[in-house]
Amino acid sequence: MVVTTLNTTKSEEIFAAAQKLMPGGVSSPVRAFKSVGGQPIVFDRVQGAYIWDVDGNQYIDYVGTWGPAICGHAHPEVLNGLKEVLEKGTSFGAPCALENTLAKMVIDAVPSIEMIRFVNSGTEACMAVLRLMRAFTGRDKVIKFEGCYHGHADMFLVKAGSGVATLGLPDSPGVPKHVTKNTLTAPYNDLETVKKLFEENPDQISGVILEPVVGNSGFIVPDAGFLEGLRMITKENGALLVFDEVMTGFRIAYGGAQEKFNVTPDLTTLGKIIGGGLPVGAYGGRQDIMSMVAPAGPMYQAGTLSGNPLAMTAGIKTLELLKKPGTYDQLNKITKRLADGLLNIAKETNNDIWGGHISAMFGIFFNKGPVHNYDDAKKSDLTKFSKFHRGMLEHGIYLAPSQFEAGFTSLAHTEEDIDRTLATAKKVMSSL
C-alpha cells in the first residue's frame, strides 16, 4: 500500500470544531470527503496551480475551486483589477458600468447569447432559466438528464432511477412530489427516450436542459449526433433547448460547448469562470426570450448582489486573459498530456479505467467503460477510486474527492506538474 506521511493535525482540529458549527462541518457536502473517506483537508492559500493546507502541505490542484480558476489561482491581473475596484466599494445595488463590459464580452463570445442577466450562482441561473422557459412557452414540464446537475433548486433535485426514471420523484427530503412532478428525466445520450417523452406529453414540455458535456457525474461526453438531435427534436416540438454551461462555458472553448460542437441552444446558463473565482452566475439567450425578463417583461427575477463590481471585474480580467492567442491550444496540450498519461498508466498497472478530456476538462472512471451516461458511471469501482484519491492526496496531488466529478487544468499548470502527477499516479495505481 501507499505509505501515508501527510501531516493533517491542524486540518483535523479545525474540521472537528467545524462539525459543531456547521452541518457536517462544511458549507458544501463534497468537501467533507464522504465519497472517498479519510480526513478532509482544510486549505489556507492558493497560487497558480498550487494549493496549501493549514498544515503547510502543498498540492498540485486539479479541482480549481470547482472550475473558476482556469487562469490559475490568484492571477496577478485579476487581483490587481480587484484591488483597484475594491477602493470604490464592494457592491452598489444599482447599475454598474462594469456589467456592460462583461455582458458585451459574453455576448460576443457565446453564440446563443444576445442578451444576458447576471445573478450570483449557477443554481440561481438555472432556477431563473427554468422559470423563463415556462414563461416563454406557456408550458410547465421540462426534461433533464440523469446525472446532469443544475443546482440544488427543488425542481432539479429529481432522482432518475431505472424503473422510475421519468416519474419525477424527488431526490432529497424536503422536496414535495408536486414540485418535481413536471420534471421529466431521460438517460444522457438517449435521443429515443427524449422523443418518447415529447410524444407522451404533447404541447406540455417547455424545453430540454442539459450539461452539454457532463461534469457532475464524472466526465461524460456527448455521443456523435446527440446535441444535434436534441436541437432538432426541440425545434420540431416548439420547445426550447438550454445548455447549462456553468462548467463548460469558457472552459472547453472560449464560446463554450456550443462553439466546440457547433450546436446553438436557445438559452444558456453560465457561472464559475465568468466570475473569476468570485460568486457569480448568468443566463442569456435569444433577445425575444430574454425580453420576457423583468423589468423589460413580466417574468420576475432579482438579486441584491447581482452584477456587483467585484465579480464583474474578476470576470472581465479572466476573459481578457483567455482571449489571448494560443490559450486554448495550451490548455488542450497540457490536459491531453495528463489524461492520456493516466490512461496509459492504468493499462501498464492492470487497472480498468475509462476517461478522456476536452480542452481544460478531464476525468477518469475506475470502470472498463464505455461510459455514455450516469448508469454506466455508477458501475465504477468506488473503493478503488477512494484508495487512488487518498494515495494521490498523500503525495501532494489534489483531485476532486468524488468519482462523480470532472477534473480541471489551468494555464498555470506546467509540463513538470503533469509529469510529477503521472509519476505519482503510477506509484499509486501500482499499489491498488
Swiss-Prot record:
Biological processes annotated in GO: chlorophyll biosynthetic process; protoporphyrinogen IX biosynthetic process
Cross-referenced Pfam families: Aminotran_3
Keywords: Chlorophyll biosynthesis, Cytoplasm, Isomerase, Porphyrin biosynthesis, Pyridoxal phosphate
Transmembrane helix keyword on record: no
Matches recorded under PANTHER family: GLUTAMATE-1-SEMIALDEHYDE 2,1-AMINOMUTASE, GLUTAMATE-1-SEMIALDEHYDE 2,1-AMINOMUTASE 1, CHLOROPLASTIC-RELATED
Organism: Trichodesmium erythraeum (strain IMS101)
Gene Ontology CC annotations of this record: cytoplasm
Family indicated by similarity: Belongs to the class-III pyridoxal-phosphate-dependent aminotransferase family. HemL subfamily.
Intracellular or extracellular location(s): Cytoplasm
Main location: cytoplasm
Keyword Cytoplasm: yes
Oligomeric and partner information: Homodimer.
E.C. no: 5.4.3.8
SUPFAM superfamilies listed in its UniProt record: PLP-dependent transferases
This protein's name: Glutamate-1-semialdehyde 2,1-aminomutase
Catalytic function, reaction form: (S)-4-amino-5-oxopentanoate = 5-aminolevulinate
GO molecular function: glutamate-1-semialdehyde 2,1-aminomutase activity; pyridoxal phosphate binding; transaminase activity
Residues with PTM N6-(pyridoxal phosphate)lysine: 272
